[in-house]
Amino acid sequence: MFYPVIKKALFQLDPERAHELTFQQLRRITNTPFEFLVRQSVPTKPVTCMGLSFKNPLGLAAGLDKDGECIDALGAMGFGFIEVGTVTPRPQSGNDKPRLFRVVEAEGLINRMGFNNKGVDYLVENVKKTRFGGVLGINIGKNKDTPVEQGKDDYLICMDKVYPHAGYIAINISSPNTPGLRSLQYGEALDDLLLAIKNKQTELKEKHQKYVPVAVKIAPDLSEEELIQIADSLVRYNIDGVIATNTTLDRKLIQGLNHCGQTGGLSGRPLQTSSTEIIRRLSQELAGRLPIIGVGGIDSLVAAREKMDAGASLVQIYSGFIFHGPRLIKDIVTHI
């Protein structure tokens, strides 16, 4: 109800400053009785996916709460699951500012944040405090100064630390803002990473006496051949799920608009069709062998349904949440 007024004020500010102010307020109320200020009632729409029970199929995508500082406040808004991160083994400041831009006319965002986060240990301490009743995903990545050839070591370090506290673990190999990261999506590099992750998952399952599923997050900028190869690798290594998709480098839908020339990943409405098409192609290729979490430009009930009709078992929002606020959660969960 109040979001259009709040949004108008926030959109007068630099996007990253607006984000910081919003999270400052959410941090104040998270894990306190004042969570009622953001709480909204949504119906239960149970879904089982990756062996986990979700109270509804709508989640918050990674990138909004990178350090897990506002899990309970965000959870009070009605999300069935929340994905925190991307987090790296060591804290890092990310790329130089400005690094976040609104393409308001297209309801899009361009970011080149560069995995800015306070490190995996800080995130784990926050996760330990949460009372969120939904499924918590933890999205992990590599530090910028870790050579790509040693990148898998960063993922294994993070897995070790987050495994006891995660509902599922998301492997981010598709951000366009960490040099060389997307090369891990292909060929031998992907197979090498998936084998190491699967072995680590088996080791941690024995150690902690619980199985935590692993999902891999992929880019939308994939050729048919690359998509087929990725699907084949995910199945061969018994990965539990795939998150499709991350942001795009394609700018054809925002040509001529403000900030269209900024480097970074584009999200929001301009990503909607291409991410849905990747989900559709992936679904055909996987033939039900592992579930898809659909993300990319969901800004309405119709857009969420399109992702699910294309083959997604669960969906996530991020940019749509920025542009439309908590009401979008209620609309999607109520009518999906």
Swiss-Prot record:
Keywords from the UniProt entry: Cell membrane, Flavoprotein, FMN, Membrane, Oxidoreductase, Pyrimidine biosynthesis
Membrane topology, record value: Peripheral membrane protein
GO biological process: 'de novo' pyrimidine nucleobase biosynthetic process; 'de novo' UMP biosynthetic process
Pfam families: DHO_dh
Cellular localization per UniProt: Cell membrane
Catalytic activity: (S)-dihydroorotate + a quinone = orotate + a quinol
Residues given in the record as substrate binding sites: K66, N111, R112, M113, G114, F115, N172, N177, N246, T247
Required cofactor names: FMN
Catalytic residues, chain numbering: S175
Classification via InterPro entries: Aldolase_TIM, DHO_dehydrogenase, Dihydroorotate_DH_1_2, Dihydroorotate_DH_2, Dihydroorotate_DH_cat, Dihydroorotate_DH_CS
Cofactor note: Binds 1 FMN per subunit.
Biological pathway: Pyrimidine metabolism; UMP biosynthesis via de novo pathway; orotate from (S)-dihydroorotate (quinone route): step 1/1
EC number(s) on file: 1.3.5.2
GO annotations of cellular component type: cytoplasm; plasma membrane
Subunit description: Monomer.
Family: Belongs to the dihydroorotate dehydrogenase family. Type 2 subfamily.
NCBIfam families registered for this protein in UniProt: PRK05286.1-1, PRK05286.1-2, PRK05286.1-4, PRK05286.2-5, pyrD_sub2
Name of the featured protein: Dihydroorotate dehydrogenase (quinone)
Originating species: Pectobacterium atrosepticum (strain SCRI 1043 / ATCC BAA-672)
